């Protein structure tokens, strides 16, 4: 079945793309969540127009993300955490924690854009990649330090 994506769908495409998908996938997943509509002549013309507008918006957003990436790339941040015996943390440092540190420093980012390779459970310095947009991935350094009591 040919569908026009209404929103970006991971592993399928961006909003406005025309895609061929299995009938069941369209009826049971894409249509109920309003992620896509059936492709017919009228919808295709409207989608083509929307895609043009979307590309302009995407280009503006990409330029804005490049500016944010320039400001973020290479920056170093400290986080104070409680530890058990030695250098082991109580719990772990998560993308939510990193997002809150970045927010305090003027960068409001979605936690899903922050990539931590493996859970941070020890003190030390860690490189963290942030996926702002396709091809724009600044790397920050996070210094995990013991909270003084």
From Swiss-Prot:
One function term, GO molecular function aspect: rRNA binding
Function of the protein: Binds to the 23S rRNA.
GO biological process: translation
Gene Ontology cellular-component annotations: ribonucleoprotein complex; ribosome
Keywords: Ribonucleoprotein, Ribosomal protein, RNA-binding, rRNA-binding
Name of this protein: Large ribosomal subunit protein bL9
InterPro entries referenced in this protein's UniProt entry, alphabetically: Ribosomal_bL9, Ribosomal_bL9/RNase_H1_N, Ribosomal_bL9_bac/chp, Ribosomal_bL9_C, Ribosomal_bL9_C_sf, Ribosomal_bL9_N, Ribosomal_bL9_N_sf
Gene3D superfamilies, per database record: Ribosomal protein L9, C-terminal domain (3.10.430.100), Ribosomal protein L9, N-terminal domain (3.40.5.10)
Keyword Secreted belongs to the record: no
Protein family per UniProt: Belongs to the bacterial ribosomal protein bL9 family.
The species this protein was found in: Leptospira borgpetersenii serovar Hardjo-bovis (strain JB197)
């Amino acid at each position: 079945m040919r569908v026009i994506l209404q929103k970006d769908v991971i592993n399928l495409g961006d909003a406005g793309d025309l895609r061929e998908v299995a009938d069941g996938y369209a009826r049971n997943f894409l249509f109920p969540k309003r992620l896509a509509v059936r492709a017919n002549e009228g919808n295709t013309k409207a989608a083509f127009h929307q895609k043009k507008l979307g590309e302009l918006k995407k280009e503006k957003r990409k330029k804005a993300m490049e500016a944010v990436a320039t400001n973020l790339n290479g920056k170093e941040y400290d986080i104070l955490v409680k530890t058990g015996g030695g250098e082991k943390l109580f719990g772990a440092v998560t993308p939510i924690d990193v997002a809150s540190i970045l927010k305090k420093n003027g960068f409001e980012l979605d936690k899903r854009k922050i990539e931590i390779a493996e859970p941070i459970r020890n003190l030390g310095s860690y490189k963290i990649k942030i996926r702002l947009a396709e091809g724009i991935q600044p790397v920050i350094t996070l210094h995990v330090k013991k909270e003084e009591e």
